[in-house]
């Protein structure tokens, strides 16, 4: 367990649901746990290797999807459904009567789905996972394959344009570059949601994928499905924010926390009990039209200490192939080549005398023996938003635990022209509020407890 707390965990993408539907202002809150708290412990280096592999594949898909979006082309891959590593879990209640499912929380995915059996298709049971038996739910309503919803609206969610009979359900084949996939049929279902005031409410007619098959062990390990939180017409976020107040928030505990420590996702107003450091609250513009369906922000620079780094403006410009998103499904932070080199060079100057190490199998570039290193010697790294807002992550969020006595700079070099991604380790121990209605992003330090 000691080793577990000192190694880099592969988290994700985010969070879960909720807020409220009553006369008094209330919201829904779900607990989230880090994926690795539920799994046997691999070696430290294998864990980081897994993180890097999955993060890199995720970043490739994000960049590819953003490029096609700018060209007005619909692509059937790269919804942000993250690839195994860097995951957080939550639980949702689906169907009537409601059944509980553990799902991967993913802010880059547009589709919510669960392992499912319908009309004899799908698994009877799965080891350590649950299967939704659709025919036992009185609220399950399949989407027909001849409907406009199937042929047009769900096309970017990988609906299949094959319709043998008018009664055939609308099918999907969700595939990802790492070989992961999910196949099934679309339906509308009832979700039972817990509220912050202790009550529950039911929301009817939410889109869900009834997955009769899925492949990709690392991606779906320990999960019953996926909760899609990217912002699109049919994502959970879109429907939940319409119902529960136009905003959602989440707080990711330190990535080395044990499984008995939960973080949360809330749809609706953030309870005052979670905003313990209101004076430190910062607000920036959330540009929802910039890189859809991802949550884009306008970063204009990075400083180390009092020094603003020399990073070309085109790194941050979407029209030049850059731009920046916040992504709870990537654990590390990706920076375009010019930004990456400036950041690691700037930080290295303050690590002179600290022994550098390149452990076998460890794919991060800059790692050090830091058992006797004082974090306070490392200057503050700060992200600068357009308009003057600043985000100053904790030092342990960019000099991250990799193995006992070893810490690494938590950055990955992306291609020269690539989307910058602020991963979940950089976001940890901050409360993040995404106000969809106002197009603002607010954040402040928090214990997330």
Predicted regions and their residues:
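Conserved catalytic motifs of the protein kinase core domain
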Residues: 100, 222, 321
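Short beta-strand-centered segments at strand-helix junctions
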Residues: 113-115, 225-236, 335, 421-424
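Eukaryotic endomembrane system proteins
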Residues: 185-196, 200-306
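Short glycine/serine/threonine-biased micro-segments
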Residues: 182, 223-226, 325-327, 421
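Aspartic protease catalytic domain
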Residues: 2-42, 84, 95-97, 105-110, ...
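Disordered propeptide/prodomain
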Residues: 2-103, 111-185, 205, 239, ...
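Short secondary-structure boundary/capping segments
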Residues: 118-122, 223, 340-343
């Amino acid at each position: 367990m000691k080793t577990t707390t000192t190694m880099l965990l592969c988290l994700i993408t985010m969070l879960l649901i909720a807020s409220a539907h009553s006369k008094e202002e209330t919201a829904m809150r779900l607990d989230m746990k880090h994926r690795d708290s539920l799994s046997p412990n691999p070696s430290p280096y294998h864990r980081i290797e897994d993180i890097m592999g999955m993060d890199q594949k995720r970043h490739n898909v994000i960049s590819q999807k953003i490029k096609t979006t700018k060209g007005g082309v619909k692509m059937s891959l790269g919804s942000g459904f993250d690839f195994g590593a860097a995951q957080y879990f939550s639980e949702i209640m689906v169907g009537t009567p409601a059944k509980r499912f553990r799902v991967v929380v993913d802010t880059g995915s547009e589709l919510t789905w669960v392992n499912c059996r319908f009309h004899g298709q799908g698994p009877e049971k799965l080891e350590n996972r649950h299967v939704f038996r659709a025919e036992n739910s009185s609220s399950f309503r399949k989407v027909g394959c001849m409907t406009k919803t199937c042929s047009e609206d769900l096309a970017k969610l990988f609906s299949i344009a094959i319709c043998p009979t008018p009664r055939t359900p609308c099918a999907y084949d969700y595939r990802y570059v790492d070989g992961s996939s999910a196949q099934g049929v679309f339906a509308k279902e009832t979700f039972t949601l817990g509220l912050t005031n202790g009550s529950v409410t039911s929301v009817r007619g939410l889109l869900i994928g009834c997955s009769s098959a899925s492949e990709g062990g690392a991606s779906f390990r320990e999960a019953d499905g996926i909760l899609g939180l990217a912002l699109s017409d049919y994502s959970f976020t879109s429907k939940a924010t319409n119902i529960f107040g136009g905003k959602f928030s989440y707080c990711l505990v330190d990535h080395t926390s044990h499984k008995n420590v939960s973080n949360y996702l809330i749809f609706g107003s953030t309870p005052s009990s979670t905003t313990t450091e209101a004076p430190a609250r910062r607000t920036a513009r959330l540009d929802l039209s910039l890189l859809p369906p991802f949550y884009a922000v306008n970063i204009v620079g990075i400083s180390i200490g009092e020094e603003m780094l020399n990073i070309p403006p085109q790194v941050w410009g979407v029209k030049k192939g850059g731009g920046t998103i916040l992504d709870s499904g990537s654990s590390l932070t990706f920076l375009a080549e010019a930004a990456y080199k400036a950041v690691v060079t700037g930080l290295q100057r303050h690590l002179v005398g600290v022994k550098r190490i390149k452990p076998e199998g460890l794919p991060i570039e800059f790692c050090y023996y830091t058992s006797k290193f004082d974090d306070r010697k490392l200057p503050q790294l700060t992200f600068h938003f357009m308009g003057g807002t600043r985000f100053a992550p904790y030092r342990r969020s960019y000099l991250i635990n990799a193995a006992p006595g070893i810490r690494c700079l938590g950055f990955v070099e992306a291609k020269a022209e690539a989307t910058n991604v602020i991963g979940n380790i950089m976001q940890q121990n901050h409360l993040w509020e995404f106000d969809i209605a106002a197009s603002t992003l607010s954040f402040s330090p928090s214990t997330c407890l």
